[in-house]
Design a protein with these regions (language model features):
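A generic fold-level signal
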Residues: 24, 66, 74, 141-143, ...
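Catalytic core of nucleotidyl cyclases, primarily class III adenylyl/guanylyl cyclases
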Residues: 160-161
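C-terminal substrate-binding subdomain of Rossmann-fold SDR/epimerase-dehydratase oxidoreductases
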Residues: 175-283
């Protein structure tokens, strides 16, 4: 059984009915903030939770540059609270949604798990510091089983089209923003810089389908059975796509041009981020 905890800061309870449409069941849902340690602990006890997948947190690079305090307070604070609740309930299996933003902007792609870590934006720094805290847990409690999943750039939706990324307000990620421009909900796509040292001048990212990302979580959970310690994996495809290439692909599929403009570079963006996913495939 799965139980969901979410404060609905950037999500909707409508997702629950969509899950029921697809699976035939509705998972138990508790509206709560992870920083409410007592409530989280109560949920763990009530549902006899044995493992946790920690997806919660703010997740936009640009927003983190504009409001770093919010990112540190929420992302790190919620994780520390979660750890406390898990320890109280004697739950020691955790899958953490980390990010490729932990890697150094000067490192060369593709990134291996051992690639130098040096985040250049507050969002990436919160992920890096959380990884460090989780790794420290192993030193004080040998029973912990931790998976650090470094996402590259997730996109896509469930094959039924009934579950996808629906942001509250203006999307912070490229693909949902692009689709809202395509559907007329937003007037124009801003591309942050076309003067990077890439073939077309725009940033290059490794885009992974959300369904493949979900499979990665289940595989990580299976891997941790019978194993202790902290284990990190890159979740990406190993292939890079530029912003313009993604836009042009969408235009080809929908059959009409996307209204777009080139603006100045955005602080906190790296030129290229491509995964070396060989460790994830091997394990």
């Amino acid at each position: 059984q799965i139980v969901i905890i979410d404060n609905l800061n950037n999500s909707s309870k409508e997702v629950l009915s969509r899950i029921e449409e697809i699976t035939g069941t509705t998972p138990p849902f508790v509206q709560a903030d992870l920083r409410d340690t007592d409530t989280v602990h109560e949920v763990f006890e009530k549902y006899s939770v044995t493992s946790v997948m920690h997806f919660a947190g703010h997740k936009a690079v640009g927003e983190s540059v504009e409001n770093p305090s919010m990112y540190y307070a929420n992302n790190i604070g919620s994780t520390l609270s979660l750890i406390e609740a898990m320890q109280a309930a004697e739950i020691f299996t955790l899958i953490f949604s980390s990010s490729a933003t932990v890697y150094s902007s000067t490192a060369l792609s593709p990134f291996k798990e051992e690639t130098e870590k040096d985040p250049i934006n507050p969002y990436g720094m919160t992920k890096y510091l959380i990884e460090q805290r989780l790794t420290d847990l192993i030193k004080t409690h040998a029973d912990w089983r931790i998976g650090l999943l470094r996402y590259f750039n997730p996109l896509g939706a469930h094959p039924t089209g009934r579950l996808g990324e629906t942001s509250i307000g203006t999307p912070n990620n490229l693909m949902p923003y692009l689709m809202q421009v395509a559907s007329g909900k937003l007037p124009k796509l801003k591309i942050f810089g076309d003067d990077y040292d890439t073939p077309d001048g725009t940033c290059i990212r490794d885009y992974i389908h959300v369904a493949d990302l979900a499979k990665g979580h289940l595989a990580a959970l299976q891997f941790l059975k019978g194993r202790t310690g902290a284990h990190a994996w890159n979740l990406g495809t190993g292939k890079g796509t530029s912003v313009l290439e993604l836009v042009e692909t969408v235009e080809e599929v929908i059959g009409y041009p996307i209204n777009r403009e080139i603006t100045s570079r955005r602080e906190g963006d790296v030129i290229e981020a491509i995964a070396d996913p060989s460790k994830a495939y091997a394990e």
